[in-house]
């Protein structure tokens, strides 16, 4: 029995399913999950000492690569001054100011400790500000595990082939309107029927939890227009895309200004963190100045804030994002060419440092199209690449990530491995 297998067997006795987040269990792809012992740069090492080129990057935060020296030093320095205050700090002001400088749509911002906290707080705020209860989300999009968001969820929920969750009361789910991603006609019909009951739309501007799915310009424009016409708020869930695709996030690339934005992952540099912000008049509805309550013991944690500030400083360097996008495009083009040579139906797409791999002729534009991709072929591809020392997301429903630490040699080695694997599929 390998060390990975022994750890998984032991973990299942004391941790539900042996993991602390469902997608890590490899239920989608089969087999034993990999237990990591350390990570540095573009590489991770498992409990058996095997080394992998990592394209998961802790599900997005590791944009600089693992254990980046500047981030590690910032964490060490902050920790030496106290792990948590439970009180305001100057560092909170510094990171909040930096976020508002980088995102014109964010006039005020509040820090929390996770992406789920950010999205559920943003929706509560939208409901409180508008006085309405219903909100729109899109099938396959994942916005955390709050009850009212686990309706046609993406990410790990899709891994089980069951896009909802037990334990979500029907009366809670009834307030969640689920539409198809990129379906402009469906949006217009819904607003025509109940527009005055809708508090907000929440959307992943580039969906990354049903693999990478890009929005059409018409879809983006329709959401902004319909929210304006009916007094609803538009929330961009940029927990994944925030500072991952551009220094101005997805909203800059798409040219759409949301009313509220949720952030996480990159702004914590690998530490647990989240944030939500937007229009000042909306944000001022939050306690202690407004009637919408939100709180958190570890919100604005000084160690997480230090890691975030160090990361934002690095990604703000001139040329960072063009270089990251070029590296990601090189990977995508190399994999596509390797599949073509082998006669495998496959395509790939990317935006910034995010990418999607699809065993289909064209990149999907909706959840339904994602579900038509060849999942079994992906599973075989995943395990074969793992055997070749390449760690991809263990699910056909997840985007992948390239970091600044990935070298041309890493990309070349990955494409070479894929070339061998595609020939066996």
UniProtKB/Swiss-Prot annotation:
CDD domains: OAT_like. It is an enzyme of class 5 (isomerase). One of its GO terms (biological process) is protoporphyrinogen IX biosynthetic process. GO terms for cellular component: cytoplasm. GO terms for molecular function: glutamate-1-semialdehyde 2,1-aminomutase activity; pyridoxal phosphate binding; transaminase activity. PROSITE patterns: AA_TRANSFER_CLASS_3 (PS00600). Pfam families: Aminotran_3. Pathway: Porphyrin-containing compound metabolism; protoporphyrin-IX biosynthesis; 5-aminolevulinate from L-glutamyl-tRNA(Glu): step 2/2. It is found in: Cytoplasm. InterPro entries: 4pyrrol_synth_GluAld_NH2Trfase, Aminotrans_3, Aminotrans_3_PPA_site, PyrdxlP-dep_Trfase, PyrdxlP-dep_Trfase_major, PyrdxlP-dep_Trfase_small. Homodimer. Belongs to the class-III pyridoxal-phosphate-dependent aminotransferase family. HemL subfamily. HAMAP family: HemL_aminotrans_3 (MF_00375). This is Glutamate-1-semialdehyde 2,1-aminomutase. The gene is hemL.
């Amino acid at each position: 029995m390998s060390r990975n297998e022994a750890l998984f067997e032991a973990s299942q006795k004391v941790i539900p399913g042996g993991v602390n987040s469902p997608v890590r269990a490899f239920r989608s792809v089969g087999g034993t999950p990999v237990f990591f012992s350390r990570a540095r740069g573009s590489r991770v090492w498992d409990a058996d000492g095997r080394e992998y080129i990592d394209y998961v990057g802790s599900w997005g935060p590791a944009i600089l690569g693992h254990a980046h020296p500047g981030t590690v030093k910032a964490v060490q320095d902050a920790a030496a001054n106290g792990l948590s205050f439970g009180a305001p700090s100057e560092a909170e002001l510094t990171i909040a100011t930096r976020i508002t400088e980088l995102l014109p749509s964010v006039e005020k911002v509040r820090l929390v400790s996770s992406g789920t906290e950010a999205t559920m707080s943003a929706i509560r705020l939208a409901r409180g500000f508008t006085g309405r209860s219903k909100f729109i989300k899109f099938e396959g999009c994942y916005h955390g595990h709050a009850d009212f968001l686990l309706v046609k969820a993406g990410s790990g929920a899709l891994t089980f082939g069951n896009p909802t969750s037990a334990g979500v009361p029907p009366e809670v789910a009834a307030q969640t309107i689920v539409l198809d991603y990129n379906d402009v006609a469906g949006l217009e019909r819904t607003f025509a029927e109940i527009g005055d009951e809708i508090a907000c739309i929440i959307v992943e501007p580039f969906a990354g939890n049903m693999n990478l799915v890009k929005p059409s310009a018409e879809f983006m424009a329709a959401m902004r227009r319909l929210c304006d016409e009916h007094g609803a708020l538009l929330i961009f869930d940029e927990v994944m895309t925030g500072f991952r695709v551009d220094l101005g996030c997805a909203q800059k690339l798409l040219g759409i200004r949301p009313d509220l934005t949720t952030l996480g992952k990159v702004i914590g540099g690998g530490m647990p963190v989240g944030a939500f912000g937007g229009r000042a008049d909306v944000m001022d509805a939050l306690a202690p100045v407004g009637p919408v309550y939100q709180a958190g013991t570890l919100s604005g944690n000084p160690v997480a804030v230090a890691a975030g500030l160090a990361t934002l400083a690095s990604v703000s360097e001139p040329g960072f994002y063009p270089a990251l996008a070029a590296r990601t495009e090189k990977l995508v083009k190399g994999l596509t060419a390797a599949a073509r040579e082998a006669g495998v139906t496959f395509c790939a797409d990317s935006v910034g440092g995010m990418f999607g791999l699809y065993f289909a002729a064209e990149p999907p534009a909706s959840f339904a199209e994602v579900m038509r991709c060849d999942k079994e072929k992906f599973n075989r591809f995943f395990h074969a690449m793992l055997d070749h020392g390449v760690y991809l997301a263990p699910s056909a429903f997840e985007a992948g990530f390239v970091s600044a630490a990935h070298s041309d040699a890493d990309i070349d080695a990955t494409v070479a491995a894929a070339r061998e694997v595609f020939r066996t599929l």
